[in-house]
Amino acid sequence: AVRGGGIVRNANGEQGVEDCRGASAAWCDCTGQIEDRFVGVSLIDCPSNVSYPTFWNVDADGLIAANPFGVSSFLGEDAGGGTRTFERDEVAMFRYRMVVHDSAPTADEIMRLSECFTQSLEIHVD
């Protein structure tokens, strides 16, 4: 958790809960220390998702969640753009890559994982 000395950061170079909460970014990472090693999770957004790059909800307890519909929650009611109506038979697909790591990856390493994910993505769902 961030309270115990962990770090939250995103693809924009922002760091810390206050700067990353509500930020729109291609990825968000939370890394902390457990005993003598660093561990964490990186969540990577896909360009085909609604509202890419997504808005992120993070907190000091280590919560990290994508929120593609959080425009007005994070930018205020006047921002608009967070409402989406889906037709009854419409299919909505959201793709994210989750990387659980037992290290403290650099921002460049996470960016490379993001680029590999978006360049090689081909998923077929029947």
Per-region residue spans from a language model:
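Trp/Gly-enriched beta-strand surface patches
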Residues: 3-79
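Beta-strand-rich recognition/accessory modules
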Residues: 44-126
